[in-house]
Amino acid sequence: MAKSMATLDSGTTCSSWNQSGDRLAAGSLNGKLSIYESSTSSSSTFSCTSKVRVSESSIVKIVWLPSEYGDAVACVCEDGSLSIWEELSEDAHGLEWKLCKSMKNKSSQVLDVQFGVSRKSLKMVAAYSDGYLRVFELLNPLELKNWQLQAEFQNVIDSLSTLGKPSSLSASVSWNPMKGEEQEPSFVLAFNSDSPHLNSSKIWEFDEAHNRWLAVAELALPEDKGDPVYALSWAPNIGRPYEVVAVATHKGIGIWHVGLAPDLEGRLPVKKVSSLSGHQGEVWQMEWDMSGMTLASTGSDGMVKLWQSNLNGEWHEQATLEPVPS
């Protein structure tokens, strides 16, 4: 029989587990951030231990920073603002969540944010409603308030395709989670916009020699390049000679293999190996397990589906989890 782990406040709009899975952050319609944790290490029941108002508008996304940078979360709000909050000790008051950094662009809204650890620093990638991507670098690992803009560009392969000011409903960013010390950081980015050039999923890799980001692959068949993308997820890689990335559009979930050896032009070979269907409506979110072997997806139909491939590389639906009426 299923057991409830936590009861979230009514009006909860999003949630996110930290890397160790012992704390849950939840955002609400009223702009409040709530932190849930268990009272003991052996308990599987979580209760709210902290609550702070982040914004006057609703929180639409929460992302935990990598654990080596402390207990901190980034919140994206409906008004397009982005803020970073850190749990700090305040003398007699004990631990409290404090605002470290707030960002708001007058002309565009933040749609998604993700963090990636490079060999030199922590990087933050923020995707905006005007189709631009901004990469920020943390200047001091001990101070989450000091971020420097490192790069700014649109999600297009060549400069001739650079657009004026498109309108984007959503964006999705997913970092390559298993980059080694000797490898450059990379991530995949896609949009759900009115501009076909922006939408398709593109892998961006940092070129340290020239201090710039380069598009090294595009995850879309020729007939699908203009399709809006709803969600992305880059799988952890444990010993595979290729990377695996999941891309969700209105046509379903595409599973892509990305080669590790670039061609003479610096592009990585890509191949779509499977198309998964089963959700009745849009796919909103996808996550891989730690092994990169099982993909979980959820969407507007309220279902959670688990997908796996067999030894022959054929993908299939492994399980479906339905919401339980309250």
From Swiss-Prot:
Coiled coil: none
A cellular component annotation (GO) from this entry: nuclear envelope
Knockout-associated phenotype: No visible phenotype, but enhanced susceptibility to virulent Pseudomonas bacteria and oomycete pathogens.
PROSITE patterns in alphabetical order: WD_REPEATS_2, WD_REPEATS_REGION
InterPro entries reported in the protein's UniProt record: Sec13/Seh1_fam (IPR037363), WD40/YVTN_repeat-like_dom_sf (IPR015943), WD40_repeat_dom_sf (IPR036322), WD40_rpt (IPR001680)
Domain of life: Eukaryota
A single GO BP: mRNA transport
Compartmental location: Nucleus envelope; Nucleus; Cytoplasm; Nucleus, Nuclear pore complex
Pfam families, per the entry: WD40 (PF00400)
The protein's role, per its UniProt record: Required for proper export of mRNAs from the nucleus to the cytoplasm.
Family as reported in the entry's similarity comment: Belongs to the WD repeat SEC13 family.
Name of protein: Protein SEH1
Organism annotation: Arabidopsis thaliana
Native organism taxonomy: Eukaryota, Viridiplantae, Streptophyta, Embryophyta, Tracheophyta
